[in-house]
Swiss-Prot record:
The UvrABC repair system catalyzes the recognition and processing of DNA lesions. UvrA is an ATPase and a DNA-binding protein. A damage recognition complex composed of 2 UvrA and 2 UvrB subunits scans DNA for abnormalities. When the presence of a lesion has been verified by UvrB, the UvrA molecules dissociate. It comes from Neisseria gonorrhoeae. One of its GO terms (biological process) is nucleotide-excision repair. It is found in: Cytoplasm. ATP binds at residues 42-49, 649-656. A zinc finger (C4-type) spans 262-289, 748-774. GO terms for cellular component: cytoplasm; excinuclease repair complex. Belongs to the ABC transporter superfamily. UvrA family. Forms a heterotetramer with UvrB during the search for lesions. Residues 319-596, 616-945 form the ABC transporter domain. Coiled coil: none annotated. It holds the Pfam family UvrA_DNA-bind. This is UvrABC system protein A.
Length: 950
């Protein structure tokens, strides 16, 4: 059943690949059906990405870009030509990868999906502006509309028609009153009181007054239309295009304006434009925060880094005994306010703390300074305050280094002007359906979707908004269908996980409605709960049904079973991979003996449920109380120590907030003395059972090509020591530094140890070419002459972990670390492989290997965020073995995870939910997997029940 003979067809329904050798691909021939959902699976490092991204996508994209003019090409990224003999049947390609969308603080979910652009258009075309001061709508009315409004009042209501002539102006207005009398008017209303014109009291000329001319007094009846119309015309003439109808019995006022303005204060707006609602445009952004929604400020808690110390011993960095100039000021302050600089900061009176941090205001203080010559001199002036001093230095410095240092004492807070809305006042007071744009953007997507689906507009506004609303509701629907209903449009794109960012791009692609395209996706199910997986698969099928080829690199069992066609790569990783084991339907793959994927699908292999669970020790618990960051509802988290705990829950239920933003930061601050700011919580108990915390996340192990697994894990130092100890090295006087590619000496100076040289191409992307001097080996000729066991340092860096493990078998310091890299399934990566080429899952496993190789006390808390990212069934089995070893030493492991194979093997589960966003943030279930599987309201429990019974 395991044959995959390429069909020798030239039809239009097949993508034909012949002789693909990109990276570790072994000259493969493969036929993939077009317009189908194709899943590429296999072990980590087996060549899945090499096939899907570096061969199919790269060639599809390259051919499309090559068809454009040279001018257009300079704006597009050109892909390297893959090493392949032939590819036929390709369509233009779009890749949707796991990279987070943007590091730009101005990008939000709304801007990335372009929904915000449609919302701007909607608010500009059918929005109703209001006066920020009086909450009255800005709309111009004709005299007829004013008359109709009065006639709608109950019959016989007594109404006074007024012309608001003077608003908030100083003066006595004697001539004004005389002029009104000459025109035949009898009454005026001054500051709310009605007077006969000849009985108006003398007005105070330095106080602001409001004066209304009384035009008419009428009783509401059907036959007063003509009289009312004439009265309103007179009122508008005297009231600067404004008129006022006051009900005489209740005092209720009805304002009217013939101009597009507030009838009370004449506040007006020019015509509404879409850019007024853009926080990335000066016309729409809040002037205080420039549309970022938050401002930086010097946080007293960061400025006073060590409140348990005294001012003399370093409560505030830079203002203690070591800095004579600033400390003299503190001593003079202490003398003036009678406090002791040698007592702990936290015991000082509040008044003293306030003066030290914020200054003495206008109070003058005598300061005594010591000059460089040793003489003292006095100065009398107010004390600036430490925080104003930092603000001034931050403003005035030209040095980026100084700014960087000062930023350590800053924190973010919502902008005081716009409250985080990002928009200027005028835009915040325009309403559609009674709601302003910034409010609608802050709702969960489900609520926003419901609001626009049921939005009822009047008259021609309905017609104008029809097409815009269709686009908005469709796009919101696509986001909800890929399991992102808990997000909101104002959420910053920087805070999205890789999986969320990818699913947003996926939803945008469906929104674009393209057909005849080849989409290549990288594990779209990452970070997605089983419950939302069905919706994601339905979305992928919808892309396919539009007439596109959808190629997905995926390990999720449901995705593999639901695919039209499966390509299984293997059999091993790295050098041992790169072959197509089987390319067929999921049913046939499940019957294939030699395919590891097939063995798991067919049930021949599986990850076993432990026969017994490690019991919880009630005396060793970590208890976090009152966690309420983001959507958490005052959560109490109980973690049994010495066990493996899984934190589960649907996407957006609060797992990352609880673990990464709260628990990890508290423990890092308390145990590792890190400068962390956890999300709000009340209390934590049980830290005495731990001595350190290690957060093994998916951030890159280095951001430059110089970082690599060997340097990160500390392997490279003992390897360089071995080379420095070779007789020829000692003879030449070479030390360890000679074998570093980061410092002068042994490295090739032509490329400064990079191995490649960047060539700037104006019409094409920058090209990296191997260095002509060292031919990509990074070192100079003399250094490469030094050999250890017949290999030079460059050849060692080019070895895979597996090859190096054998090569350094007799060197325990090196082989132990290499063995741990193999244990986490990374035998295929090269020691000198650039960190920038490692996936998030690989980077996480390199970190895990580093921790495994350290000798530990058995009192460490390990935090892992979705460690199964990018892992095949067989890799997960390896990972669980490694985590089991950490537990075996007495350590505690907390894993945020959706993968049921990991969840079912945990000792303890804490399930958050029930839903995502506002509907989540509570602990729904806790206990062993068997206990959680019985809990009715838990989505995780429902799927876990099935997994435990397999």
């Amino acid at each position: 059943m395991c044959n995959h003979h390429p069909r020798h067809s030239h039809d239009n329904d097949t993508i034909r690949i012949r002789g693909a050798r990109t990276h570790n691909l072994k000259n493969i021939d493969l036929d993939i059906p077009r317009h189908k959902l194709v899943v590429v699976t296999g072990l980590s490092g087996s060549g899945k990405s090499s096939l899907a991204f570096d061969t199919l996508y790269a060639e599809g994209q390259r051919r499309y870009v090559e068809s454009l003019s040279a001018y257009a090409r300079q704006f597009l990224q050109m892909m390297d030509k893959p090493d392949v003999d032939l590819i036929e049947g390709l369509s233009p390609a779009i890749s949707i990868e796991q990279k987070s969308t943007s590091h730009n603080p101005r990008s939000t979910v709304g801007t990335v999906t372009e929904i915000h652009d449609y919302l701007r258009l909607l608010y500009a075309r059918v929005g109703t502006p209001y006066c920020p001061e009086h909450n009255l709508s800005l709309s111009s009315q004709t005299v007829s509309q004013m008359v109709d409004a009065v006639l709608k009042l109950p019959e016989d209501t007594r109404v006074m028609i007024l012309g608001p002539a003077v608003r908030e102006r100083k003066g006595e207005f004697v001539d004004f009153f005389a002029d009104l009398q000459a025109q035949g008017f009898a009454r005026v209303r001054v500051d709310g009181e009605v007077y006969q014109l000849d009985e108006v009291p003398k007005l105070e000329k330095n106080i602001k007054h409001n004066i209304d001319v009384v035009i008419d007094r009428v009783k509401v009846k059907a036959d007063i239309k003509q009289r009312l119309a004439e009265s309103f015309e007179t009122a508008l003439r005297h009231g600067n295009e404004r008129a006022l109808a006051m009900e005489m019995d209740s005092g209720e006022e009805h304002w009217f304006s013939a101009r597009f303005a507030c009838p009370v204060c004449s506040y007006s707006l020019p015509e509404l434009e879409p850019r007024l609602f853009s926080f990335n445009n000066p016309m729409g952004s809040c002037p205080t925060c420039d549309g970022l929604g938050n401002t930086n400020f010097f946080d007293p808690e960061k400025v006073v880094a060590h409140p348990e110390l005294s001012l003399a011993t370093g409560a505030i960095d830079g203002w203690d005994k070591r800095n004579q100039f600033y400390f003299q000021m503190i001593q003079s302050l202490a003398h003036h306010y009678k406090f002791d600089v040698n007592v702990a900061w936290e015991t000082l009176p509040e008044k003293v703390k306030k003066v030290v941090l914020h200054g003495s205001g206008k109070e003058v203080i005598d300061f005594t300074y010591l000059s460089e010559r040793g003489t003292t001199f006095n100065r009398s002036h107010a004390f600036e305050g430490i925080i104003p001093n930092l603000e001034r230095r931050y403003r005035e410095t030209d040095s980026e280094t100084v700014r960087e240092k000062l930023r350590e004492y800053q924190n973010h807070r919502a902008c005081p002007s716009c409250g985080g809305a990002r928009l200027r006042k005028e835009a915040r007071y325009v309403y559609v359906g009674g709601e302003p744009l910034h409010e609608v953007s802050a709702w969960p997507l489900t609520k926003t979707h419901r609001f626009f689906e049921t939005l009822d507009l009047d008259g021609n506004k309905k017609q104008i908004a029809e097409k815009i609303l269709k686009e908005i509701t469709e796009r919101l629907g696509f986001l909800i269908n890929v399991g992102l209903d808990y997000l909101n449009l104002s959420r910053s794109a920087e805070t999205l996980s890789g999986g969320e960012a990818q699913r947003i791009r996926l939803a945008s692609q469906i929104g674009s409605g393209l057909t005849g395209v080849m989409y290549v996706l990288d594990e779209p199910s990452i970070g997605l709960h089983q419950r939302d997986n069905d919706r994601l698969l339905a979305t992928l099928k919808r892309l396919r049904d539009l007439g596109n080829s959808v190629i997905v690199v995926e390990h999720d069992e449901d995705a593999i079973r639901e695919a039209d066609f499966v390509v299984d790569m293997g059999p091993g990783a790295g050098e041992h991979g790169g072959n197509v084991l089987i390319a067929d339907t999921p049913e046939n793959v499940a019957k294939c003996e030699k395919s590891v994927t097939g063995q798991y699908l067919g049930g021949k292999k599986s990850i076993a449920v432990p026969s017994e669970r490690t019991p919880v020790n009630p005396g060793r618990m970590l208890v976090l109380k009152g966690a309420r960051g983001n959507n958490l509802k005052n959560v109490t988290l109980e973690l049994p120590l010495g066990l493996i705990t899984c934190i589960t829950g649907v996407s957006g239920s609060g797992k990352s907030t609880l673990i990464n933003d709260t628990l990890a930061k508290i423990t890092a601050r308390e145990l590792n003395r890190a400068q962390e700011e956890p999300a709000p919580y009340d209390d934590i108990r049980g830290l005495e059972h731990l001595d350190k915390v290690i957060n093994v996340d998916q951030s890159p192990i280095g951001r430059t090509p110089r970082s690599n697994p060997a340097t990160y894990t500390g392997l490279f130092t003992p390897i360089r020591e071995l080379f420095a100890g070779v007789p020829l090295s000692r003879e030449r006087g070479y030390n360890v530094g000679r074998f570093s590619f980061n410092v002068k000496g042994g490295r090739c100076e032509a490329c400064q140890g990079d191995g490649v040289i960047k060539v700037e191409m104006h019409f094409l992307p920058d090209v990296y070419v191997p260095c002509e001097v060292c031919h990509g080996k990074r070192y100079n000729r003399e250094t490469l002459e030094i050999q250890y066991k017949g290999k030079n340092i460059s050849q060692v860096l080019d070895m895979t972990v597996e090859e190096a493990r054998e090569f350094f078998d007799a060197v325990p310091t090196v082989s132990r670390k290499l063995q741990t890299l193999m244990d986490v399934g990374l035998g295929y990566i090269r020691l000198g492989q650039s960190a920038t080429t490692l996936s998030g899952g690989e980077a996480q496993r390199v970190k895990l290997a580093l921790e495994l190789s350290k000798r530990d006390t058995g009192r460490t808390l390990y935090i892992l965020d979705e460690p199964t990212t990018g892992l095949h069934f067989a890799d997960i089995a390896l990972l669980l073995e490694v985590i089991g070893r950490l537990k075996g030493k007495g350590n505690s492991i907390v894993i945020i995870e959706h993968n049921l194979d990991v969840i079912k093997t945990a000792d303890w589960i804490v399930d958050l939910g029930p839903e995502g966003g506002d509907g989540g943030g509570k602990v729904i279930a806790k206990g062993s997997p068997e206990q959680v599987a019985k809990i009715k309201g838990s989505y995780t429990g429902k799927y876990l029940k099935v997994a435990l019974n397999k």
